[in-house]
């Protein structure tokens, strides 16, 4: 079996993501992703409920929902950064630092797999260039095809 150009490119991406996560460690890598994700989710879900409170503090404004969203996002993000700094102090101890690197490696593999799935999903869905020949030759596409094809079907239903 030959390795296609797409497999080579995706393999390099996977390697970079995995090595980066291993070097940074699980705590830093996980909290760098979780802080943005949690802050965005909490801000999206809660900013409308907090608008009356910020209206009392800031008065009436057209930009009040945007300001409330930003305040909520930054507040949750700062809390997550504080938790990250606390966890980092525990993760840098001699006994746990090795586990931090090992878990970072596995987290990098998971993160890289998700990234490759998203890239393949976008390659399947995009209408600009025909990449079906490249995708057909790809071993990585064959391995991840159950996830990718379900995503393609879902996206085509929503479009």
Curated annotation (Swiss-Prot):
The keyword Magnesium does not apply. Keywords: Cell membrane, Membrane, Transmembrane, Transmembrane helix. It is found in: Cell membrane. It comes from the Bacteria. This is Uncharacterized protein TP_0522. One of its GO terms (biological process) is toxin biosynthetic process. It comes from Treponema pallidum (strain Nichols). PANTHER family: COLICIN V PRODUCTION PROTEIN.
């Amino acid at each position: 079996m030959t390795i296609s150009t797409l497999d080579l490119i995706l393999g390099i991406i996977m390697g970079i993501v995995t090595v980066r996560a291993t070097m940074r460690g699980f705590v830093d890598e996980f909290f760098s992703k979780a802080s943005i994700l949690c802050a965005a989710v909490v801000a999206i879900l809660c900013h409308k409920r907090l608008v009356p409170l910020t209206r009392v503090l800031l008065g009436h404004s057209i930009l009040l929902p945007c300001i409330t969203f930003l305040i909520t996002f930054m507040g949750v993000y700062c809390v997550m950064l504080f938790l990250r700094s606390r966890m980092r102090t525990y993760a840098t101890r001699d006994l746990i630092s090795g586990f931090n690197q090992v878990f970072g490696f596995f987290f990098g593999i998971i993160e890289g797999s998700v990234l490759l799935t998203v890239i393949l999903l976008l390659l399947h869905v995009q209408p600009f260039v025909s990449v079906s020949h490249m995708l057909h030759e790809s071993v990585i596409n064959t391995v991840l095809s159950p996830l990718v094809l379900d995503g393609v079907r879902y996206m085509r239903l929503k479009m």
